[in-house]
Amino acid sequence: MNNLNSENMCNCCNSANSCGGTNGISWDREKCEYCGPCAIKCPNDAIMVVNPKGLELPSRAKTERANEFKMCDLCGTCVSACPTEALQMGKIVHNEKEYDRIEFTPSLCDSCGACVEICPQNVLKLNEEYKLKGFCVMCLKCIDACDKTNQNALSLK
């Protein structure tokens, strides 16, 4: 199982506390059918799915790279790079357990693109309609969508 969080990761961060904790959304490569409901349900386009053969799936989430399952891993590099503090590390409580999340304040964002350039997962993007897309807000919609496929490839750890 690939744990898509900041565990065992910190070489790219500017400070020790800029990385998220060891909690996050986990992806089980063996169970995943690259079917795409998790990416379609994600309100912030934080998940990009390409099937194992490299063909793009018909969804809002697309990537030029083949054979990848990319999503925000809450590493916090975008938080460190943001000069206006529009991005901050925060917490969400689910089933009485605290999880890391990245919080975005659009009114502080000047669309400089520093977070987009530094993101190690290459999931952040700027556009005219929404100032910033691609960060995980821990809404858990991807997990619900994956559960409906009976594959349970995504889980909260």
UniProtKB/Swiss-Prot annotation:
Domain of life according to the entry: Archaea
Details of cofactor binding: Binds 4 [4Fe-4S] clusters.
Annotated 4Fe-4S ferredoxin-type domain residues: 23-52, 62-92, 100-129
Residues at which [4Fe-4S] cluster binds: 32, 35, 38, 42, 72, 75, 78, 82, 109, 112, 115, 119, 136, 139, 142, 146
Keywords of this entry: 4Fe-4S, Electron transport, Iron, Iron-sulfur, Metal-binding, Repeat, Transport
Xref: Pfam families: Fer4, Fer4_7
Gene Ontology MF: a single term: 4 iron, 4 sulfur cluster binding
InterPro entries: 4Fe4S_Fe-S-bd (IPR017896), 4Fe4S_Fe_S_CS (IPR017900), Polyferredoxin-like_ET (IPR052977)
Required cofactor(s): [4Fe-4S] cluster
Family annotation (PROSITE patterns): 4FE4S_FER_1, 4FE4S_FER_2
Keyword Ribonucleoprotein part of the UniProt annotation: no
Protein name: Polyferredoxin protein VhcB
Organism: Methanococcus voltae
